[in-house]
Regions:
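Mature catalytic domains of secreted/periplasmic carbohydrate-active enzymes
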Residues: 1-194
Length: 194
């Protein structure tokens, strides 16, 4: 995912309205116009991945997020230097599988689209979904609307039909605990597999 706090992260002026949260007033540390240099952020991102791959033992996969930003400006996608990053990852740990959501360059080892995927894939799939509707993090407005065990079973069936893994997210509460609705749902799904 993006580090929205980094002053040179993709900005809304260059990369569209979804690149960063639209704070009012705008975040003072964000760089715009001639002051913005995406390459500083790209190097920061590479250094973060280097830290993960050199300080924490063997890693199975790197799952890059935020694909809508580079895809919003196809003529500028090369500025993200994605293939260089993929090659760097494999130079540090050759076994690492690399994914950038549904695929940015077509050289990813697997695809990880959100929620729904139609069609076929020439690489393995991992479908990503949430127990809260519309949110990857805790959102109080979703109280009482979390997904049921039946809905999770439907997601599992959809993933199985695609021969895909299901990555199922629960947004933790502010204290780090799992929402009681999600605990109940996951316990019920677990019972169905016993």
């Amino acid at each position: 995912g993006r580090d929205w706090r980094h002053p040179h992260a993709p900005n809304n002026g260059d990369w569209g309205g979804n690149a960063r949260p639209q704070y009012d007033p705008p975040e003072e540390s964000y760089k715009y116009g001639a002051a913005h240099d995406l390459q500083i952020y790209v190097e920061f991102m590479k250094n973060q991945i280097t830290e993960l791959l050199t300080n924490y033992g063997p890693i199975g996969a790197i799952w890059l997020d935020g694909i809508s930003t580079p895809l919003s400006r196809p003529e500028k996608v090369h500025q993200f230097r994605a293939q260089e990053l993929y090659d760097h990852i494999h130079s540090l740990q050759p076994q690492v599988l690399v994914s950038y959501k549904q695929g940015l360059l077509g050289t990813e080892d697997f695809k990880a689209p959100e929620r729904h995927f139609k069609g076929t894939s020439d690489v393995p799939l991992e479908i990503c979904d949430t127990l809260q509707p519309y949110s990857w993090g805790h959102d109080r407005s979703n109280e009482g609307a979390h997904k049921s065990a039946d809905q999770v079973m439907e997601m599992l069936d959809h993933a199985a039909d695609l021969k895909a893994n299901l990555l199922l997210n629960t947004g933790p509460l502010p204290d780090g605990s799992i929402h009681p609705e999600d605990v109940k749902t996951l316990a019920e799904v677990g019972k169905r597999f016993r």
